[in-house]
Structures are given as C-alpha cells and as structure tokens.
C-alpha cells in the first residue's frame, strides 16, 4: 500500500469512528435527558392542607382578624394567602395575602386587643389556609393558604391569613382586635433575658478589636471555641459572662442513654405553635362525643352508683404487644373517679367488650379491681397488663401513697387477676399476689425520700409511675416506666453547665445558656428537671414477679423537663418504638409554655423514639421526638391527652393512638365527663418520621379493622359548623390554669391530617402503580439496543480484523459476498460504542424506541462514512 493509499485509508477510518462516536453521544444525551425529566418529576409527598382563616405568629400572644394588616422585612414569621406563591430557598418565613406580596425581613410584632398588649419576640411560626400545597424538601413546618404553592427547599415555616397585607421594614406593629383580649405576664420574667442576649454582638469580617482579643484570652480553650463558632464578638462579653462560660462542662463523654435536650423541648413547643398537620391531633366532631355509658358504675370509694370521669386507660395485651383476644373479649383497664372529689378519687376499673366490637355503648364495667372499700389515701394510677402463660392477667400499675402528708409517693406495683368469663360477660374472680415491685434505687432512679429532702419541693416534680410491661421473644419480661434520675446523673444547678443538655449548635446553646442564667425561675426549674424513662428486668415468675436487674434510663430529660409519662413500647418489625406523653409546662422554658397556651390553649404532646433493640440506644423520631401535638384549648370537649399507642394488625408501619377526651372535673362544662376519645392512626415512615393520618374510629376503639373507620368523628376548626371541634360557647373561653389565668387559643388555625391515599414521600418510589424507572431497560419486551451487534444471526465481520492471523489486505472489503466491509475501519469505534451502550443499561427512564431509532441512524452514518472511505481508496488504486 502506497503512502497516499494509507492516508486515504486512515481518513476513511477516522470518518467512520467519528460518525459512530457522534451517534453514541446523541443517543446518550437523549436517554440522559429523559432520565433527568423522570428524576425531577418525583412526588414530594407533601399533603394539601385545608385552612379557613386565622393567622398565627410564633410569639407570646397572637390574635388575628380578617382585614388585619401586618408586615415586615427581615422576619422570622410568615403568612401566605390565596393564590400566593412562595419559592424561596432556605427561608425562615414568608407572609403574603390575596394577590399581595410580602417583602419583610425582621419583624418584632405585637398584636394587641382592646386594652390588652402582647409583646411577641422572634416569631418563627406559621399558619396557612385552604387547599394549599407545599413542595418543601427539607422543611420543619410549612403550611400555606388558598391555592398557594410553596417551593422552598429548606423552609422553617409559612403562615397564612385572609386579606392580610404585609409590607413594612423592621416594624414593631400592633394590631387591634375588637373581639379577643390577651395579656401575657411572662414578659416580666423574660425581658431581661432578651436584653442580656442582645448584648452578644455578632462578629464581622474586620480585624478583631483589642477588646475582642483580650476577652478571648480570658476564655478557656473550649469556651473561646464555642464563642467563635457562634460568631459572637468576644469583645461584647462582660466579665461575668466570661466567668460563666468558663464554668461550662464541654465533655463529650458517651451518654448511657438518649437525651431529650433543651433544643428538643423547643422543637416540641414550637411544633404545638405551628399546628403542623404532620403532628397535630385530628380535630374531632364535638357533637359526636359522648360520656362513656360504662363509666356509670359503683364507685370504689363511696360504694355507690355514680358517673365517673375516665382518664388513663390501657388494654390487656398478649406477649407480642397486640390487644389480646381474651376468650372472645377485649379487656381494658382504666383510671376512673368521681369528678371534683376532695383529695381525689383515682382508682382502676376493668372494662370489657366483645373483641372487634366498635360500638362505644357496648362496653361494660366489671368494677373496681380492688373492690369498693377504697380511700383517697391509697390510690391506683396507670400501668399495663399482659396475659400470663396460665391464662391469668398480670397487672402492673402505680400505687400512690399520700399518707402522713406525703406528696404522691409513687411506687411500681403488680397483681394477678383471675377472671370468670362466659357468654354473659367478664367478672373479677380474685386478685392475688399484690405487692410493691420498685420504689427507686437512689442511684439510677430517684426515691421519694430524695425528693422529699430536696431543696425545693414546691417546684420539683417526683415521678415513679406508669409501668409498661414488654415481653421479649425468649419470654423475659421488662418494665419500662416514668421516673426521675438518681445520683448516677442527678438534678442540680450543675446540669445548666452541661453542654450536652442543650442539644443545639454553639449559637443556640450560648443563647439558651444565658437565657436560663438570667431568668431566676427558669433557672430553678432547669436545675430541678431530671425526668427519665427507666427500664428494669423482672425474674421469670410471671404471677409473682420480682425485680431482677435495674438499668440506667433509656431516655433522660435533665435540665429540659421533669415529666415524661404514660410510657409504652411498640415493636414493629425489627424495631422498638418508645412513646411517652408530656407537657411543655413541665419543662424549664416558661416562655415557650406561655406561647403554647396563648396560641393553642394547651401544651400537651406525645414524643417518640426508635431503636434496633429494647435496651437502646434510642433515637428521637422527627429529630426532636415530637409525634403528636395539641390541637385545641384544654377546656374544649375535644381536648385529648394521655396518648397510648398499640400496633395495628396487618400494618407493620402504623400504630393506633388512644387517649381520653375532655379534662377531668368538668373542664369543658358541667355534665361533660372525661371519656375515651376516638382513636386515630399514625404512620411510621422508613426515615424515622411520623405522619398523622385522616383515619378516626368510634370512641374507645382499640382494635383497628375494616369496620373501624368512622369519618363522622372527624371535625373542623370552624365555629358553628355541624362537625365543629368546639361546642357552642367554647370559642374564646379562657382556660383557668391554677397559676396561669389568661385567654388562650387565640392563634388556632385549621389543619387537616394526611389522607392515606396521599402517600408520604417514602412510599412513592415503592408504589406498584408508579414503577421505578430501572424496570424499563430490563423489560424483555423492550430489548436494549446492544442486542443488534451481538445477535448471532448478524454476520458482522469484526471477528476477522481482531483475529491475529487475519492479514490487513484490502481483498476482503471488495468481496461482494461480504457487504459489511466497513468492519476494519469501525473496529475501534464499534468497540467504543458497544461499551458505551453497556454503560447506559442502568440509566433510568430510557425510551426504547428512541434508543433503537438513534442506534439505527448511527449505524447508517457509520456505513456511509466507511463507504466513502472505501470508494476513496478504490479510486486512488485505480488511478
């Protein structure tokens, strides 16, 4: 072959290679574009929210009215309304109205009523209205208004209100309302905190001043690092503040259990304020709520027939944790008593109904478990119950002793119930083996004597109650219970200096640290707060158990809260879910509690944790642990508390939540006894978040089945509606909290729980109706393009050029019996194309017909280019 022939041969070869590579790139672009389109079209899982009107600001007092004007320009609160669209990225809030735009950035608003003043500071809350859709990906709370769409990527809140306009720049506004009055006294206790914190100036990019450098030298290494991380100008610190910072214990030693931190407490309290439908207890139809017929029975103290309040209740469960089908009956034990009885009337009764019977009126009362000669000195509080191997019922409960002027000396106790069961009902035959199990050990858990001899009984809260039995697969039994920490990690002022108790970044921790130091009352509460969720192991004697071993707490709430009650554990799959009811009022942030009471009218919540094993370590659900939050004021008929979760048969990712409704002693009006509430479903998501579902039952339903759902029990937040969550006269009624007497519920806003037909985000990719895109390339009916070149029936000549024995003579390309002569020049390109196609196999969303078309075009172009090269070679040879 001459030199010129070689040049022409190479030119033809390079042309063919370039053609094939170009075709491959074109096909790849087409596939990638399609895959990106599918990826970007993922369902974000955010549910629509049904809102009427009501605006809410995350401050001490909120009162809103239609046509009210509020606005600001650097603002941490936000309101959005009809047809408004928010598309911010990392936004703390946005306020908009009907076709109105808000550009405000830091507003310290105060909303006042006739003759009342409210000073809300640092609003982070948000409220929204009808039919809003939120598309936030990482969002702490987001609710929007009529047909409003929010597309924020990291959004802390959004709030909406009809006809509200926002447009001022750094404005301390006041809005008058003729219908509601609200006064907050907390400002006297917290204003100095804000003033002190305001002295902590932020650093800038300038050279540190001499004062800054001098103060940094006064701080120890860890304290200086925390101040710098918080971007605080050390020059603004006083000598007293420097001295306090140097006392902080920054140790990162491993904790023995999980912690509910000060940051978690804030998250729980703010979740109540935001009324996020992900956590908020559903609204119930107040007119459908009935007193429990079975609560009319012989009272344990008086021995006479009486109507009783019903409070904490729990089912008899089988060893797996499901509600027991006990010889055809479902059994429930409940605390009950005559309302407004001096010194209390709190005892436990056995209730029963046919298993699976959802009719609230069919429940019957087998009577007081410990007879009708009880007194108010020795009372029984809540616990749990399990079926023993011999068919008896093992009851675990709280024995409360108030003799000798004791202030609720609580002890964990047990007893064995022998029942007579027939077609006519259930009767208590005998109660055996009653005895005290545990009184605290002083080391892991506080004893009553430690509490009684403490420095401040008035503000301290002693807890050793609510034992919940858990049976492991090997038959071992454990009790999980509410307690306070013992000397192992005891309550003290030192806990305020324990950095691990704060739970936030250095900026949050330092701010909270000085907040507690500068507020005498909060500091006192923080030094006393030592709530705990404890655990102990029982021996193998089911009917007469003793304590075998006591362990460190599963969860402690040092410095943050003094009470986490109604503990219970639900095993779902291979995970253990630990739940507890709590009140923000038992925490050490009174300003946060005041905010909850003012805006919602209640401060109750249910918290939850998850672990791979019973002994932990537990991780909080939803980051802060919040699972449920109060929805209505505490004195409404539909106010709920004492939440208890049970597993749902056939649904390993759901729990049924039970509670009681209407606070005792006729809090919601004369004749409205505390009663069992409708139950509802909470979804447990794979990412350790939870979602309240729009599924409610009749009152007192403990077993979810196909007949359980009753949408008539669901209500709305609308005064005068047929299914209103409030009875006539309840709107605006003040709640009398023994130490706090104020108007409440001024920031209530409608919310709507998620409908199961609108799956939460994790459910989307595994929904059979929405197949994941990788299924396309492996579908036999849609062969991928690489099938053509590797088809045995295709007599492609590439085998010849790669054979070492094959010469590179041009004889073969001109043989008419081998029309695929371009084999030699496309050898390298063909190999590249084949490898590239193979790499595309896992691409998502590939359009098969598009791929085949592009492949065919690429082959034609390659053949054409090769033919040109061949013709060039032939022509040159002929010449």
From Swiss-Prot:
Segments carrying the region annotation (Disordered) are 66-213, 743-830
Q: Where is this region: 7 X 16 AA tandem repeats of D-N-A-T-S-G-S-T-K-Q-E-S-S-[IV]-A-N?
A: 66-177
Instruction: Identify the residue span(s) of motif LPXTG sorting signal.
Output: 841-845
- Activity-pH dependence: Optimum pH is 5.4. Displays 50% of the optimal activity between pH values 4.0 and 6.2. A pH above 7 leads to a complete inhibition of the enzyme.
Description of the deletion phenotype: The wild-type strain metabolizes sucrose with formation of acetate, mannitol, glucose, kestose and levan while cells lacking this gene do not metabolize sucrose, do not liberate glucose from sucrose, and do not form mannitol, acetate, kestose or levan. Growth and acidification are lower in wheat doughs prepared with the deletion mutant than in those employing the wild-type.
Pentaglycyl murein peptidoglycan amidated threonine carried by residues = 844
Family matches, as CDD domains: GH68
Q: So where's the catalytic machinery, residue-wise? A: 312 (nucleophile), 565 (proton donor/acceptor)
One Pfam annotation, family name? Answer: KxYKxGKxW_sig
The compartments listed are: Secreted, Cell wall
Q: Where is the composition biased (Polar residues)?
A: 66-180, 189-213, 754-821
Under which EC number(s) is this enzyme classified? 2.4.1.10
Q: How does activity depend on temperature?
A: Optimum temperature is 35-45 degrees Celsius.
Signal peptide start and end residues: 1-37
Family membership noted in the UniProt record: Belongs to the glycosyl hydrolase 68 family.
What is the name listed in the Swiss-Prot or TrEMBL entry for this protein?
Levansucrase
| UniProt source species | Fructilactobacillus sanfranciscensis (Lactobacillus sanfranciscensis)
Q: Which gene encodes it?
A: levS
